A protein has these predicted regions:
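Active-site neighborhoods and metal-handling regions in enzymes and metal-associated proteins
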Residues: 1-383
C-alpha cells in the first residue's frame, strides 16, 4: 500500500472531520474534491475527471463510489476498504448508484454535507445527484469543511512542503542556468521539470508559466515557444511538488541590461513583498495581507498594473490548478494560523509599455513571523 502518512495520522484527520461534521449537525459528508479524498485517506488518482464520490459518516464509515479503472488505484493508495464500482455502459447513472450505496449505509432521511464547489462535480453530474437524492436525504453545502482542516499542515505535511521547496529551488536554478540570449523557452522548461522529476517530485497541479517578450505579461501558460532576444524579459512561475504538496516560485528574469522601468518595478515588488511578509502572522486575515500589498503598489502609482489578488494557500493539490483555498484578496476574512502555507506573488504588468516584473515566494506561517520555504535571493536576476 502506497501511503505517504501513518495510519495514525489518517485516523486523526478523519476524527477531526467527524468532529467538524458533528459541530455542523451533519450525519455524513459526500466528497467530490480529490484533495479531500487524498487528505483523509491517501486516495491518489486523476480519475475525478469522471464521477466519483467518497462518503464519510459520523459513525466513521468510509465508502468510495468510483469506476473500475480506479478500483486498484484506491486499493493501492488509500485506507478505504469499502469500494463500490459504478458500471461504464450506455445509459449509466452513477448518481443513482450513489443513492443505492447511501441506502446501504443507512443514510435515508439523514442530513449530509456535500462538496459542490469542486472540479470533481460538474454541473451535469451535480444535477443528477440532486435528482437522485431528492426526497432521500437532506443535502447542505459543505465544500470548505475539509478545506479548513487541510489549511493547517501537520509536522509530517510540513516535511513534504520543505522537500517540495528544495525541489522547486533546484528547478528555479536549473531554469536560470539555461536562460540567456538565444535560449529556447522549451529548454528552460525542460530543465525545470527535469530537476523536479530527477529529485523524486511529482507533476504539478497546473502547467508552469513561461513567457518572454510581450508574453512575459501573461499570468497563465500558453502553447508556443520562442527564443530569447539580446535584450528581453522572461516571466516564469513554477512549483516544486512532492507527494502532491506544492511550493511555488515566480520571477521575471532580465536578459541584457535592465531598463529603468524594470529597476523601478523590482524595487516596488520587493517593498510590497516585505510588507506582505510582515502581515503573514497568526490572527491577521487573508484580506489584510492583500491590503498590505495594495498599499505599497498603489503608493508607487502601480495600481493599474497590479493584480486584484496577491497569492493563495498551497498544499496537496490536483489538476487543474495548484492554487488552494483561501486566496489573498480584499475583504477575505479567513484568519491566518501557524502551520498554514501561502504563496505570495507581487505581479506588475504594464501593457502600455510592454514591461513585466514578478516576484513570488512561499512561506510557512509561524507563531510570529513567517518563514520562507526557500531562501533563494530576491534580488533581480539578470542574464
Amino acid at each position: 500500500m502506497a501511503l505517504h502518512f501513518t495510519i495514525s495520522e489518517y485516523q486523526q484527520r478523519i476524527k477531526a472531520a467527524i468532529a467538524s461534521m458533528q459541530s455542523n449537525n451533519l450525519d455524513g459528508l459526500l466528497m467530490f474534491q480529490q484533495e479531500s479524498m487524498y487528505y483523509l485517506t491517501g486516495y491518489d488518482t486523476f480519475g475525478f475527471c469522471f464521477f466519483q464520490c467518497l462518503y464519510l459518516g459520523v459513525d466513521g464509515k468510509l465508502a468510495l463510489l468510483t469506476r473500475m479503472a480506479d478500483l486498484r488505484q484506491a486499493q493501492h493508495t488509500s485506507v478505504i476498504e469499502d469500494i463500490r464500482i459504478w458500471t461504464d455502459q450506455a445509459g449509466a447513472q452513477p448518481a443513482t448508484q450513489l443513492r443505492d450505496m447511501l441506502e446501504s449505509l443507512g443514510t435515508r432521511g439523514k442530513r449530509l454535507g456535500i462538496e459542490t464547489n469542486s472540479y470533481g462535480l460538474t454541473h451535469f453530474n451535480g444535477k443528477a445527484v440532486d435528482a437522485a437524492l431528492d426526497g432521500f436525504c437532506r443535502l447542505t453545502e459543505s465544500t470548505n469543511l475539509v478545506n479548513l482542516l487541510r489549511l493547517i499542515k501537520s509536522p509530517a505535511e510540513l516535511k513534504y512542503v520543505r522537500k517540495a521547496g528544495a525541489l522547486g529551488e533546484e528547478a528555479l536554478k536549473a531554469g536560470i542556468r539555461k536562460t540567456k540570449a538565444g535560449a529556447d523557452e522549451g529548454d528552460i522548461l525542460a530543465a525545470q521539470h527535469a530537476a523536479i522529476f530527477s529529485g523524486g517530485g511529482d507533476y504539478a497541479g497546473n502547467e508552469f508559466i513561461i513567457g518572454s517578450g510581450r508574453d512575459a505579461l501573461l499570468g497563465r501558460y500558453k502553447s508556443g515557444r520562442r527564443k530569447l532576444s539580446r535584450r528581453d524579459q522572461l516571466t516564469i512561475e513554477l512549483a516544486g511538488v512532492y507527494r502532491h504538496y506544492h511550493v511555488a516560485f515566480m520571477r521575471t528574469i532580465i536578459i541584457g541590461k535592465p531598463s529603468a522601468l524594470h529597476i523601478r518595478m523590482d524595487e516596488v515588488c520587493r517593498a510590497a513583498l516585505s510588507e506582505v511578509e510582515s502581515a503573514l502572522q497568526p490572527g491577521k486575515t487573508a484580506g489584510e495581507v492583500f491590503d498590505a500589498h495594495a498599499r505599497v503598489m498603489d503608493a508607487h502609482g502601480m495600481q493599474k498594473h497590479r493584480f486584484n489578488a496577491c497569492g493563495y494557500s498551497l498544499g496537496a493539490k490536483f489538476t487543474p490548478s495548484w492554487m488552494d483555498f483561501p486566496m489573498l484578496y480584499r475583504g477575505n476574512e479567513v484568519e491566518l494560523s501557524a502551520g498554514m502555507v501561502f504563496f505570495t506573488h507581487m505581479i506588475l504588468m504594464d501593457s502600455d509599455l510592454g514591461a513585466a516584473f514578478c516576484l513570488g515566494r512561499t512561506y510557512i506561517i509561524g507563531d510570529k513571523m513567517p518563514k520562507p520555504v526557500s531562501r533563494y535571493p530576491l534580488t533581480m536576476i539578470v542574464r
